[in-house]
Amino acid sequence: MLAALLAAAAAGAHAEPVLQGKDAYGDWRADKPGTVRLIRPQDLVRPGATRSVASSSRVVPRPPEAQLQVPAGFKIELFAEGLRAPRIIRAAPNGDVFVAETRAGTVRVLRAGEGGKVATNEIFASGLRQPFGIAFFPNGDNPQWVYVANTDSVVRFPYKAGDLKARGKAETVVASLPDGGHSTRDIVFTPDNKRMLVSVGSLSNVAEGMGTPPGGMEAWAKTQPLGATWASELERGAVLAFNPDGRERKIHATGIRNCVGLAIQPQTGLPWCSTNERDGLGDDLVPDYVTSVKEGAFYGWPWFYISGNEDPRHAGARPDLKDKVTVPDVLIQPHSASLGMTFYQGAQFPPEYQGDAFAAQHGSWNRSKRTGYKVIRIRMKDGKPTGEYEDFVTGFVVNDTEVWGRPVGVAVAKDGSLLISEDGNGTIWRVTSAPR
């Protein structure tokens, strides 16, 4: 009854105009399923156009009248509750749902029963150090390992389909990842199973106090990957690459302040990042983004953002990089805190959803207007992003100061439904599409 009460009525089916320019920024009051936004590099405001504001939300218990909103033709229901701040969720090939409970140091396995509700709930592994990313290796229907990205390492467990408990102790694959600061580490494998990609966020906001690189700037730039940082930010604000056994470590891409969510795009095989950009430049800078990540590319942080826009806090520091910044594919409302992402490959949603991406927006703290706290759909056309994104699930915000949910993870279940975790009240929600 509770789940039915909280399951939302679908939003209207009429087409919404695309919000562009300053209209695309807005706040939570403009959010509803079907609202489409397009933020372009030329729409950016100047740094300091508004003052930087600390405005964290207060997480409250889920109100009895709370209703999540989804597009017409969809339904959303409670899938699991009572979890310990669930973060990243990943569906195993057999249909089991693996959940990272980062604060608790555990990875949990959920198995659905009749009616799509959780019937089995077991701790797969415990004693982990802030686990976040989860990946099954090798890709395909018969993985032999479950990899877990801790905040300071990557470990793996031997696995057979249907395991509810780890069948062996954690084997360390990568013994040392940069620790502290932005602590989430996500993990994916390339389609050919040859490389393991791990995202590592920055230690700081904009590399404050990084100083001068060893040997001087000119020598550093000649010998290191494009845009590589050093000292306290060494191998940070980056995606790292390894062999599946942890060897042949290298930097895959740089300048990505905090790639919280990693996913492989099925059509291209390219990794994508869901990224938290920097704070402190005002309400409407800098847009978060979701983007494909090309090997060897530099995405700007900390010296530049969204092309060659220089961060005033690093004025004149790296003129050699100004024209070498890769522009992200899809810009998101600033300070939305874009976290987990996935690509839709299921058989349940309408055909126009095939290949589109979903990303969880955890919600703002550095904006005077409450922003985020929703799940968005990122539109693709022939495997390429249009630059537009639309609100897909809204309703986590109670008022200007309070929220009851903060979306973190998204995953496509074996039956084609979309699962969404939120760590405010420890729940996972399931979006289904009506038969067509």
Predicted stretch roles:
Residues K75, A85, P93, R103, ...:
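Beta-rich catalytic cores
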Residues P17-P71, P143, T184, S202-K250, ...:
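Beta-propeller domain segments
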Residues L78-L83, I123-R129, V173-D179, I251-G255, ...:
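Surface loop/turn motifs at the tips and blade-to-blade linkers of beta-strand repeat domains
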Residues G82-R87, T106-N139:
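Blade-loop segments of beta-propeller domains
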